[in-house]
Amino acid sequence: MIDLLYNHSLDVYSANGEDGINEYILKHLELDSGVVLEIGAWDGFFDSNCANLWSNGSYNGILIEATSKLNIADLESRYDNINCYRELISSSNTLEDVIEKCKFDVDENNFVLASIDVDGDDLNVARSLGKYKPIILIVEPNGDVITRSNSNGSTIKELIDFGVDFGYDFMGMSGHVGRHSGNVYLIRNDYKDKFDICSKPWQQRGIILSEGLLY
């Protein structure tokens, strides 16, 4: 029996079970430290997919938010293991550019997880990671659409295809079955063999739509 990601759902700060899924994946990979990045960080905690990792001190965090919701001075005064940036990611100010500015080293061995939730431009923002490739990449799709590009945001299949081109494989999705969809989980190819789920066709890896349909 294949162990689908959503079976490990648990929310501390996250909205769709990501905190529990992250814990499951990182424990399976025997990772307990490193760097995590969240773009679309809000105040650092609300619906966060990374706060449960950096707030306990085990991980360094890079928090990026384009609005004033992120109180940089307050957060950085309370946590010395995070860097906060009020930045709008664009073609002239990429994620790669922001990562280059942070106070701690980031490389392929310690860049554990990145979560991208920017309401519609997630795919372009993910591409702007450039040379920085986290082990786990969490990206928000348009939860209503698997393969059709008929509305705002990226389809699930577009994110899966991006992952293939970027050196990743699709692990499945977060979400609460029968309630709402969550995020697409991608794992870097040099780690995918540690999970049986990656041996199945992508349609069988746990796709949750906002209508509650499960594929």
PLM region descriptions:
Residues M1-S9, I208-L214:
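Membrane-proximal basic amphipathic "stem/tether" segments
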Residues Y6-C102, N109-I116, G143:
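SAM cofactor-binding core of SAM-dependent methyltransferases
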Residues V35-E38, N52, N56-N60, V106, ...:
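Conserved acidic-Pro-Pro-aromatic motif
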